[in-house]
């Protein structure tokens, strides 16, 4: 039996995979999608840099790369998240690692749901959705 959502962690950092699964599943379900087959890979900058260069022609690491092969309301795809980039983002935005990991995971799920962030108005809509879902999964630090 195959799992519709498979999470792979290629790093030594421990991740709360059950929480990440809940986040991805919730976002996609609430956006009107079912997961047919989804692979989530949490990796380091070296791996995501290689993927970014090979598949997108960008010669630098990034926080997330999403590939969607979906048709209709069934999600078929994969996403890669660099935990190194998540850590850098967390420092830059002065938030905890776990909160930034949730945000980037939500961001990846939203890409799979069809949201884009290439234009300013798309980015604003994406950030609003991220904030909406983030409130549900992250307790704000004081």
Swiss-Prot record:
Family annotation (Pfam families): YbeY
Compartment(s): Cytoplasm
Free-text cofactor note: Binds 1 zinc ion.
SUPFAM superfamilies referenced in this protein's UniProt entry, alphabetically: Metalloproteases ('zincins'), catalytic domain
Major localization listed first in the record, in broad terms: cytoplasm
Binding of Zn(2+), residues: 107, 111, 117
Keyword terms, alphabetized: Cytoplasm, Endonuclease, Hydrolase, Metal-binding, Nuclease, Ribosome biogenesis, rRNA processing, Zinc
UniProt GO BP: rRNA processing
Single annotated GO MF: RNA endonuclease activity
A single GO cellular-component term on record: cytoplasm
EC number: 3.1.-.-
Cofactor: Zn(2+)
InterPro entries associated with the record: MetalPrtase_cat_dom_sf_prd, YbeY, YbeY_CS
Tree of life domain: Bacteria
NCBIfam families linked to this entry: rRNA maturation RNase YbeY (TIGR00043)
UniProt family annotation: Belongs to the endoribonuclease YbeY family.
Function: Single strand-specific metallo-endoribonuclease involved in late-stage 70S ribosome quality control and in maturation of the 3' terminus of the 16S rRNA.
PANTHER family: ENDORIBONUCLEASE YBEY, CHLOROPLASTIC (PTHR46986:SF1)
Protein name: Endoribonuclease YbeY
Organism: Chlorobium phaeobacteroides (strain DSM 266 / SMG 266 / 2430)
């Amino acid at each position: 039996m195959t799992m519709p959502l498979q999470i792979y962690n290629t790093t030594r950092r421990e991740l709360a995979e059950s929480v990440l699964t809940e986040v991805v599943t919730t976002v996609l379900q609430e956006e009107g999608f079912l997961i047919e087959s989804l692979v989530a890979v949490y990796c380091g900058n070296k791996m995501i840099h290689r993927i970014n260069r090979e598949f997108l022609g960008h010669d630098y690491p990034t926080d997330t790369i999403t590939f969607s092969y979906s048709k209709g309301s069934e999600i078929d795809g994969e996403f890669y998240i660099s935990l190194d980039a998540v850590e850098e983002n967390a420092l830059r935005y002065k938030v905890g690692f776990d909160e930034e990991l949730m945000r980037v995971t939500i961001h990846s799920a939203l890409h799979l749901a069809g949201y884009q962030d290439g234009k300013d108005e798309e980015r604003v809509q994406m950030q609003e959705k991220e904030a909406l879902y983030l409130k549900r999964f992250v307790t704000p630090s004081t």
